[in-house]
C-alpha cells in the first residue's frame, strides 16, 4: 500500500485549513500583539478567526464562530496548502493555534513549527532534541504531543522527555528550558499534554501514570523566568517524611499499605482548565498506578486524589475543593 503522509496530516487538521481559506475576509480585524489573559477571555468574539489557546479559550469551547463555511459554500472547499512536519513514528493530537496570522503547531516529538497561516511557509522551527529512546515511556503507540501554549510573547511546549520549554514567539529562539521531573526514587515520565498559560504562569502535568512507579503532580512556572511558582501533588508520598502541603496529609488517610513505594499514579496528563472568575485551576486527575487497588493500596479507602477534579488557587497553589468521581479507583 502506498503511504501518503502529507494527506494524512492534512486530514487531521483539515478543519482549520478550511477556515483559513477564507482568512482574507477577516484578517484585517485580527488584533496584533501578545496573547494576554484579557485577549483570551474576549476570544472568540473579538477575533473569531484566531485560535489563541488549547480548546480555543479558557472555557475550551472548541467552537468557531466563523460563518463563511456553511451549507452553501462547503461544496467549494478545497486544499489550500499542506506541509510535512513529522514522520510515521509519531502522532499529532493537538489543534494548531492561530495567532496574528501565524499557525503554531507541534509534532509528536515536541518540535514546534511557526507557519504562515495563509501560505503554509515555515517561519521558524524549534527542535528540543528529545532523545528518541524515551519512546519507551509511550503508553499508546508512537510519540505524541497535544499542542502548545502561546502567551505573553512566548510559545510553550511540554516535551516527551519531561521538560517544559519557552521560546520567543517571533524568532523561535529558546528563552528557558526546565526539567519538570522530581526523581523521588520513582520512574521518569513523559509530557504529552498541552501546557496552559494564564495569570502570569504556565501550568503542566505529566503522563506515564499507567506505567507504574509514578506520582502525579502539577507545577506552575513563572511565564517569564521558568521559576517554580508552586507545585501541587496529587497523591501523597511517604508518610514518614514531612508532607509537601496540608492536602497530602488529608489524602494519606485514604490510602493503605505502602503505596508510596509504587508512586500511586494520579498524573494529570492533559486536563487543566483556568477559571478567570475564581482565579482557579481545575485539574483532572488520572488513574492509580498500579491499576489494581489491592496492589497499590491494600485495605485503602478512596485513594485521594485519584480520578478527581481538584480546584487550586493559581496564586497560592492551595486547594479550594475537590470532587472525586471514582473513589477507590480500581
Language model regions located:
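Acidic, proline/glycine-rich low-complexity intrinsically disordered segments
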Residues: 51, 59, 65, 85, ...
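N-terminal secretory signal peptides that target proteins for export/translocation
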Residues: 1-10
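Active-site-proximal structural scaffolding
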Residues: 44, 211-214, 222, 265, ...
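Short glycine-/acidic-enriched loop or helix-start segments at secondary-structure transitions
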Residues: 63, 115, 213-214, 292-294
